[in-house]
């Protein structure tokens, strides 16, 4: 019964998760299951857990019992327990702490038996061996963390004579040279050259040659830049330039034998520019041309044409006969017709380039002529020479005299760069410093002071601005493009001048230019100041422009003023008087003001002219210091239809006589005491009882110019007065008086003075008359001015009008002016 039960139960298949634990074979082998055992066995079974309730990851560490075979006498190190969420990071930290504890334990154990030194020594040897293995491999070996690599480099740098340190410096030199060559261009070549000289180019000349050749082959348009760089270095270190040239010639010969047209073209282009820089002799250029033209093929002709375009200008200047021979050979090849049509066309284009004198292919482009021809060292290397390319210079090789050679190059570097802070002359006996000339030290300062007196850059800038303006559809596009033009600092006025000049060239004024100027003025203060400066310049030189250009320029500035693009204070340069204006300047001001009135209206313009803050700037346009200038300005603005802006001047002109009379009276009263002594002799000889002294006027009349004045009175006394000029008479005729423009002796206060300008009735009440030409205070009594005649003349019966009279009816009788008269003047004649 029990056996059958066991057989029926045991073969029953169960899932692994539900199968009970199998009883120990040792305990069950001796006996079989009993009925009492079966319930006990079933009671031990428990339901299996749900797989979904299981944890996502197994426990990170199992607790195991201590191994029975562990030696209790051995020193035990407890593994550190680090709490961290990230298991990988926790494991790494635990390992690091464990390694540290082990090292500390080893150090403690070695204090007594001297094992510490052995441990440290073995660690240093291991690190050095690993670093040597790293340096010996071309690929750099396995990855080393940066911190560990820096530690290894610092360990190797302790001994500068070691191969490890030399390898580190070699790798740094290679990276530095490659980086500097890859970023050189026309604009920064002057900054790259000192940095290159800062590296040891004598030790790394192979690296430099390889790097510059690779960079040139990958970017042919930069060939002139690389050639200029080699030329500069060749002046100081000729062995570097010679090595570059030798490798180029060797590379050209190999490429020509292999029919590699691409390499031939790149190498020949580099050689051509080295010839242009006088690093290579022209004989190598001629050899290359003859080699390509000896047995012409399509590829050789293409290489020869490309080479000739680069070196043609140099050969035409230095070897004209050989240059003509080469072109004769080109012509013969063209006439033979054994090459393709494409190559024939290339030769024809080459002849056209020669006819144009290589204007698109200059020998030395602008900005790369950095070495004087006398300072350059030319290497005479030909295609037939046995060349030593020195490929071993590209590879690292330990130098037993590394420190001494570095010190020698540092001395050369100080001589080249002119570093005055370091000691100089300590290595003057070295083989490198003997090859340097003292005159070469001044190359960099001389080049820094070169000035382009031809103003080529300025012409190119103006051309760019002109083409940009002409190619724009509207003013917004023009401003947008002009803002992208690279205008040098301080040259902003050139853009303003070009906009104005383009505007002046139009047949009629176009508002397109005015809107451009307005937009620029409102973009930045720099452009506002530039256009204000341009206004003053064009106002001073406006007489040089013809009428049409003058009109366009005037309307342009009128638009800027009306739109507040520039300040109205720029009108301070305008002085509206007869002496300081010309016909061109008056027309210019008229056009400017008319444009302003057209856009703003006369009322707004008049209001702006009356702003108190701007009145000092308009003092020249609306003068109120001199009635003559005020009258001129009033007439000018009235004639151009802007009489409304002259109201202040008209008011001033009406009040001017009263103010002037008050000033003259005060001045005459203050100086009346000094006039008695000077007028005594003239009073006794004068027949007119109310005439003043003329002695002061006669003595100073030789120095001042006087004008004649006429009286408005028709009373029996003489009715006309004259202003004598250059009077030399000691005494005036009777009943006449001389008056000087600049009297130096005071005269007694006058009673009354008449102005002929305001008299319009036969017998008006006495009025005062003002002379526009008189600029010094003069008393206005009822006195008459005399001529320079030495005998009295009978008084005329009719009055005479002065020069400034504006009476509508002319006088019936006139009298001549007698200037510098030395004889008695005849009585006046009727006309």
Curated annotation (Swiss-Prot):
Domain MIF4G: 174-357
One GO CC term on file: cytoplasm
Disordered: annotated segments: 1-89, 414-450, 670-831
Subcellular location: Cytoplasm; Nucleus
Gene3D superfamilies: 1.25.40.180
Chief localisation class: cytoplasm
Bias (Basic and acidic residues) ranges: 73-89
Sorted UniProt keywords: Cytoplasm, mRNA processing, mRNA splicing, Nucleus, Spliceosome
Record flagged with keyword Cytoplasm: yes
Signal peptide: none
Residue ranges constituting the MI domain according to the UniProt record: 460-576
Biased segments, Acidic residues type: 433-443
Low complexity bias spans: 1-17
Keyword Cytoplasm found: yes
Listed Pfam families: MA3 (PF02847), MIF4G (PF02854)
GO biological process terms, semicolon-separated: mRNA splicing, via spliceosome
Record GO terms (molecular function): RNA binding
Function: Involved in pre-mRNA splicing.
Similarity remark: Belongs to the CWC22 family.
Quaternary structure annotation from Swiss-Prot or TrEMBL: Associated with the spliceosome.
Protein name: Pre-mRNA-splicing factor CWC22
Native organism taxonomy: Eukaryota, Fungi, Dikarya, Basidiomycota, Agaricomycotina
């Amino acid at each position: 019964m029990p056996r059958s039960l066991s057989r029926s139960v045991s073969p029953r298949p169960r899932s692994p998760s539900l199968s009970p634990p199998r009883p120990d074979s040792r305990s069950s082998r001796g006996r079989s299951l009993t009925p009492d055992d079966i319930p006990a066995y079933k009671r031990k079974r428990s339901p299996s857990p749900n797989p979904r309730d299981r944890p996502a990851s197994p426990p990170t560490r199992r607790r195991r019992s201590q191994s029975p075979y562990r030696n209790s006498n051995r020193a035990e190190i407890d593994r550190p327990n680090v709490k961290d969420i990230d298991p990988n990071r926790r494991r790494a930290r635990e390992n690091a702490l464990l390694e540290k504890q082990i090292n500390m334990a080893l150090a403690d154990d070695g204090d007594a038996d001297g094992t510490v030194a052995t441990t440290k020594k073995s660690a240093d040897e291991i690190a050095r061996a690993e670093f040597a293995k790293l340096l010996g491999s071309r690929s750099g070996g396995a990855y080393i963390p940066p911190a560990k690599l820096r530690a290894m480099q610092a360990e190797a740098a302790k001994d500068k004579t070691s191969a490890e340190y030399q390898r580190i410096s070699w790798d740094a030199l290679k990276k530095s040279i490659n980086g500097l060559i890859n970023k050189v261009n026309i604009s920064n070549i002057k900054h790259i050259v000192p940095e290159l000289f800062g590296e040891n180019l004598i030790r790394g000349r192979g690296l430099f040659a390889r790097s510059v050749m690779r960079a040139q082959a990958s970017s042919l348009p930069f060939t002139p830049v690389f050639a200029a760089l080699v030329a500069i270095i060749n002046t100081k270190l000729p062995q570097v330039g010679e090595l570059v040239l030798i490798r180029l010639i060797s590379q050209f010969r190999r490429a020509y034998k292999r029919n590699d047209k691409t390499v031939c073209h790149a190498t020949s282009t580099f050689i051509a520019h080295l010839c242009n820089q006088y690093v290579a002799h022209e004989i190598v250029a001629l050899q290359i041309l003859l080699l390509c033209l000896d047995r012409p093929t399509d590829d050789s002709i293409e290489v020869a044409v490309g080479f000739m375009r680069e070196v043609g200008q140099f050969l035409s200047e230095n070897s004209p006969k050989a240059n003509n021979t080469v072109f004769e050979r080109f012509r013969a090849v063209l006439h033979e017709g054994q090459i393709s049509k494409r190559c024939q066309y290339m030769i024809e284009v080459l002849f056209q380039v020669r006819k144009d004198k290589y204007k698109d292919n200059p020998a030395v482009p602008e900005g790369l002529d950095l070495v004087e021809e006398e300072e350059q060292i030319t290497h005479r290397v030909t295609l037939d020479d046995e060349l030593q390319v020195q490929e071993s210079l590209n590879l690292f090789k330990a130098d037993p005299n590394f420190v001494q050679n570095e010190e020698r190059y540092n001395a050369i570097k100080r001589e080249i760069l002119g570093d005055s802070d370091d000691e100089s002359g300590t290595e003057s006996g070295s083989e490198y410093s003997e090859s340097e000339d003292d005159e070469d030290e001044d190359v960099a300062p001389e080049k820094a002071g070169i000035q382009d007196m031809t103003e080529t850059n300025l012409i190119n800038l103006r051309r760019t601005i002109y083409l940009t303006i002409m190619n724009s559809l509207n003013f917004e596009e023009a401003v947008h493009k002009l803002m992208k033009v690279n205008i040098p600092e301080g040259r902003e006025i050139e853009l303003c001048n070009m906009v104005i000049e383009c505007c002046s060239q139009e047949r009629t004024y176009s508002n397109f230019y005015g809107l451009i100027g307005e937009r620029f003025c409102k973009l930045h203060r720099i452009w506002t100041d530039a256009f204000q400066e341009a206004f003053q310049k064009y106002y001073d030189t406006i007489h040089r422009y013809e009428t049409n250009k003058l009109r366009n320029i005037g309307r342009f500035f009128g638009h800027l003023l009306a739109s507040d693009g520039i300040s109205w204070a720029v009108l301070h340069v305008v002085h509206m008087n007869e002496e300081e204006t010309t016909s061109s300047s008056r027309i210019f001001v008229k056009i400017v003001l008319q444009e302003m009135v057209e856009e703003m209206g006369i009322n707004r313009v008049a209001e702006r002219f009356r702003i108190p803050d701007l009145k000092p700037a308009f003092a020249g346009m609306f003068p109120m210091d001199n009635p003559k200038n005020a009258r001129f300005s009033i007439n000018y603005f009235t004639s151009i239809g802007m009489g409304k802006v002259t109201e202040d001047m008209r008011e001033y002109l009406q009040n001017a006589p009263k103010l002037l009379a008050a000033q003259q009276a005060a001045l005459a009263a203050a100086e009346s005491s000094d006039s008695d002594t000077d007028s005594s002799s003239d009073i006794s000889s004068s027949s007119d009882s109310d005439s003043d002294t003329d002695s002061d006027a006669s003595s100073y009349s030789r120095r001042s110019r006087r004008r004649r004045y006429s009286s408005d009175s028709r009373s029996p006394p003489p009715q006309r007065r004259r202003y004598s000029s250059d009077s030399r008479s000691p005494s005036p005729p009777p009943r006449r008086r001389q008056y000087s423009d600049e009297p130096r002796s005071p005269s007694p206060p006058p009673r009354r003075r008449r102005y002929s300008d305001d008299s319009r009735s036969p017998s008006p009440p006495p009025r005062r008359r003002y002379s526009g030409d008189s600029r010094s205070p003069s008393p206005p009594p009822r006195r008459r001015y005399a001529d320079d005649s030495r005998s009295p003349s009978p008084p005329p019966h009719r009055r005479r009008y002065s020069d400034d009279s504006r009476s509508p009816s002319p006088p019936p009788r006139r009298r001549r002016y007698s200037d510098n008269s030395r004889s008695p003047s005849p009585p006046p004649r009727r006309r």
